[in-house]
């Protein structure tokens, strides 16, 4: 279910403050807020999004606006399905 338009996009307050202050900075903004939506003000900024283990740097571009930060930092690693161990010999 989508968020109501009258409520507007959700962005954590601490992340919004960091984005405002890091307008021309090259240093990535470290955040644990995967639920925050990407706003047009964030375009061109590198945000390091936590995936549960470490921070994944995400360079925000205009195609990402409207999506959430967590969509670009994968939390699960697929190692492959189990195969027949005898065929490897």
From Swiss-Prot:
Q: What cellular-component terms does GO give this entry?
A: cytoplasm; small ribosomal subunit
Q: Which Pfam families match?
A: Ribosomal_S19 (PF00203)
Gene3D superfamilies from the entry?
30s Ribosomal Protein S19, Chain A
Q: Does the keyword Membrane apply?
A: no
BP terms from Gene Ontology: ribosomal small subunit assembly; translation
Q: Name one GO molecular function term.
A: structural constituent of ribosome
Provide this UniProt record's keywords sorted from A to Z: Ribonucleoprotein, Ribosomal protein, RNA-binding, rRNA-binding
Describe its function: Protein S19 forms a complex with S13 that binds strongly to the 16S ribosomal RNA.
NCBIfam families given in the database record: rpsS_bact
What the record says about family reads: Belongs to the universal ribosomal protein uS19 family.
Q: What is this protein called?
A: Small ribosomal subunit protein uS19
Q: Which organism is it from?
A: Xanthomonas euvesicatoria pv. vesicatoria (strain 85-10)
């Amino acid at each position: 279910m989508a968020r109501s338009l009258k409520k507007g996009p959700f962005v954590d307050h601490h992340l919004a403050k960091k984005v405002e202050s890091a307008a021309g900075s090259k240093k990535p903004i470290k955040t644990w807020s995967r639920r925050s939506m990407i706003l047009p003000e964030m375009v061109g900024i590198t945000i390091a999004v936590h995936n549960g283990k470490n921070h994944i740097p995400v360079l925000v571009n205009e195609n990402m606006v409207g999506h959430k930060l967590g969509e670009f930092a994968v939390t699960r690693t697929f190692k492959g399905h189990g195969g027949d161990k005898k065929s490897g010999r």
